[in-house]
Amino acid sequence: MTEFYDGYETLCVPTSIGDFPVRRGGTGLPVLLLHGYPQTHVIFHKIAPLLDPHVTLIIPDLRGYGDAPKPPSDEAHLAYSKREMARDMAEIMSALGYERFAVAGHDRGGRVAHRLARDYAARVTHLTVMDIAPTLRMFDDTDQAFATAYYHWFFLSQKAPLPETLIGADPAYYLRAKLEAWSGEGEWLDEKAYLAYEAAFSQKDVIHASCEDYRAAATIDLVHDRADDHHKLTMPIQALWGKTGFVAKRYDVIAAWQEVAQSVTGCAVSGGHFVPEEAPQEAAAEMLRFWGCS
């Protein structure tokens, strides 16, 4: 975990499911950065140097991904629910002494951040979500176009070991295909970062845990989301999304988040899905402005 983020601390933070390796650097407002699928904490390696002169960054892997703990799965997929993943993050921040903090999440990390803001509203000062609309909205609006573009939601949520077996036959091919399909044009993927993603994603337990993440999203996460869907989040919300991605084409992103939050701002940035790597300069400027640091 030490190949990226020069000058950052590498911490081993205890939680109720085990120790999480965490990178920490910078000064000022504590900001928790959460990665998505099929990546790791490494996704923030370009944007971190633009942010850390102004804020303190705390960058873990999500449970099941990278070097994070990988608890056993269960039939109800509770172990990989966003509620449990959010609890991990709350425990990490408590262990590090941060009772109030901002959180920014990309892809699956944005969904964990959304649940964190729901379940720990008094602790989250600002929420940034990158290239997603709310999970419940996306499932409820499913049609042929969505199912085609987001087929992985329905593939990965199939009963084990079907997706695990198929991905495990050539995880590097699957990983590269996803990164290329979801991104915009241009050279954005650093080869060193790609090799880190490949090393993590090639592990059988990571493949299984990431499938469990999506199984939870299609089952228990929807139960949790429907239970509190009528309560709007009150902290400031920022939505950032790639101009050329499916989310930009499919949704009025600000309006989608206004359905679940009282105060929403945001904008599109260059590129496709992988906002922190495809548009680090634009995204960093918007995030710092949102946090009142610019």
Language-model segments: residues:
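Proline-centered flexible-loop/turn and helix-kink motifs
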Residues: P38, P53, A121-A122, Q262, ...
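Catalytic histidine-centered segment of alpha/beta-hydrolase-like enzymes
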Residues: G272-A284
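Flexible "cap/lid" subdomain of the alpha/beta-hydrolase fold that forms the substrate-access gate
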Residues: T2-L11, I17-V22, P30, I43, ...
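Short beta-strand element of the alpha/beta-hydrolase
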Residues: L29-H35
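A short, Lys/Arg-enriched amphipathic alpha-helix followed by its capping loop at the start of a domain
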Residues: K46-V55, A95
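The serine-hydrolase catalytic nucleophile loop
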Residues: Y37-A48
